[in-house]
């Protein structure tokens, strides 16, 4: 969401009928959007750690912006380096960035769980926000 320009950027993967329809939308077409829904985030963390994988990184970008430049750390994972096109966007917002890829093409080889225990051990975070594949969310919740 860019309030100054009055624009909304959507990031999605074409999987089902709805995203196929969305892929056919052209610049200038009108869309109806409902939201935000839910309860939002507790923004009181002083040292937030954002943990995301795959398309789960999209909503965390908006959250990082909400915390302000340099406040959050990001631990991001993807299948390959190509899936981590987000790095430039997050570099502008986060004080530290930790990367993992399943194939080891960038960052640490493995999932975000490869780095999470060390980040917890080192401290430096007072709240963890996670979005992404269910196995990652489950692993973070039990770490």
What is each residue range found by the language model?
Residues 1-27:
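Ferredoxin-reductase
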Residues 17-143:
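FNR/FR-type flavoprotein reductase catalytic core
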């Amino acid at each position: 969401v860019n309030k100054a320009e009055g624009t909304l950027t959507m990031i999605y993967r074409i999987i089902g009928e709805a995203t196929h329809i969305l892929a056919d939308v052209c610049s200038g077409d009108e869309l109806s959007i409902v939201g935000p829904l839910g309860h939002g985030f507790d923004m009181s963390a002083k040292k937030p750690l954002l943990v995301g994988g795959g398309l789960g990184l999209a909503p965390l970008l908006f959250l990082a912006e909400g915390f302000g430049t340099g406040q959050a750390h990001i631990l991001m994972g993807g299948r390959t380096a190509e899936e981590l096109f987000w790095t430039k966007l997050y570099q502008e917002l986060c004080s530290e960035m930790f990367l993992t890829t399943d194939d080891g093409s960038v960052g640490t080889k493995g999932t975000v769980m490869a780095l999470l225990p060390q980040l917890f051990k080192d401290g430096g975070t007072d709240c963890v926000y996670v979005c992404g594949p269910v196995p990652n969310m489950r692993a973070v919740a039990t770490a």
